[in-house]
Amino acid sequence: MDKGIRTGFQAALALAAATVGVMPGAAMAQAKPVTIRAVMHSGLRITDPIITTAYIARNHGYMIYDTLFATDANFKVQPQMVKEYSVSDDKLTYTFTLRDGLKFHDGAPVTSADCIASIHRWGKRDSMGQKLMEYTVSLDAVDDKTFTLKLKQPYGLVLTSLGKPSSNVPFIMPKRIAETPADKNVPEEIGSGPFRFVKGEFQPGLKVVYEKNPDYVPRSEAPSWAAGAKVVKVDRVEWLNIPDYQTAVNALINGEIDYIEQPPHDFLPILKAASGIQIVNYNTLGVSGMLRMNWLNPPFDNEKIRQAALLAVNQQDYLDAQIGDPDYMVPCLAMFVCNTPNATDAGAPKTDLARAKQLLKEGGYDGKPVVVMQPTDLAIAAPLGPVTAQALRKIGMNVDLQSMDWQTLVGRRAKQDPVDQGGWNIFHTFWVNADMLNPVSNVGINAKGRKGGFFGWAEDAEIETMRNAYALESDPAKQAAIAKAVQERAYAVGMYYPTGQFISPLAVSPKLTGILEAPAPVFWNIEKK
């Protein structure tokens, strides 16, 4: 390994070890447990997977929590913590019974009360959860292991919602923790999942440690996407934050780490050429990028100026800057994912700088700076901000491109303050396509504004009416027609701009086997030689 790279890697490990008082050499010498050392796409600071849609929090959630239902590789919803369930003849009452042996990491049994409190909290934050709660009359405990969900009218997305595979996943927490206000981070990291969170070794943004949960009782079925048995085959998993990807790549090649969640695409040829390194596409559905404007702050509180922005940008520019390799990118302006039942290009804008300039004038743009937040430590998102800045400058907008780390962006995007008080105008993010397949699950289409909408707080009553219609419709052809109308309206009012679809594979050590296809990078079933 290059001396500078080795020094950088050792410095990262020393920083990660310093808080717990163990230098990396001593820690490695004493390490007897089978440990996977992984570099994830971002450091973990927010440990609550309900208050944020950030994928690092979702990934953390899959480590320590479990779910009532889960989606399998055939996109069918399967029981997970639930042993059995029934639906009344009028389709208004769902009855759920929990499996035997479910236990939280503090030793307490999982009860109906825990599940009810967790669903209520999730239902205040998540797009699909909010919609489910709109049609829910009550959630009631029958006994410690059985509870009911009663509806106002038949609603076909009950199990789909409870088995939602990605942000926000309806993870089950102890009742006392789930009663935390839905806009506050939970005070404890206690679940019933296959790993336990090692709080004493947690260094926010730097290092997270998980250990195998010896009390976890897996299901008997084979693992399939988010469903089935979650059998842990190692003792510990450590997430290390190594922001310099050259350092991380060299550490993987030299066997000092085992796993990189999101290696930059321009490093893939190097990794493929390295002896034994595996490039694993765990998410075959792929990922979609998103440009999100803030509807609360000028100038994007004006529809004409939002429309101008959509006409200024070009999706291919984003894909070229972000991915660059045609084998890993798919131009796609379908908001509900290309090559799916709801895919359509209806309403999609075509770049038109002259028209964008005219709309900017009609909208009364006053030349004030537009704050674009750019996460410099997240390779998959870092190139997007400069592309947007260049496009907006071409039509005459004054752009303030502000660099920060991803976790700072995740915190700041929740602020509804004016720009001069720490607010913002634009940020970019990305979603696994499992989150984007329909108008109910796609949070970019949530048009509730300040009353439960996604960051940017887009508000449109017409879209909300159509989302309700989609949720109640069971005919796939009619659902597709509604999705088409939703997309046309979403583009017309400037909900967001899709920056393209792509594949983001893992890079892993030859020592690891058993990596599963899943909606998130999961660590059960993985063995280390």
Which residues does each PLM region occupy?
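Surface-exposed binding/hinge segments that line
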Residues: Q30-A31, T97, K131-Q203
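Periplasmic-binding protein-like
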Residues: D48, L296, F300-N339, P383-L384, ...
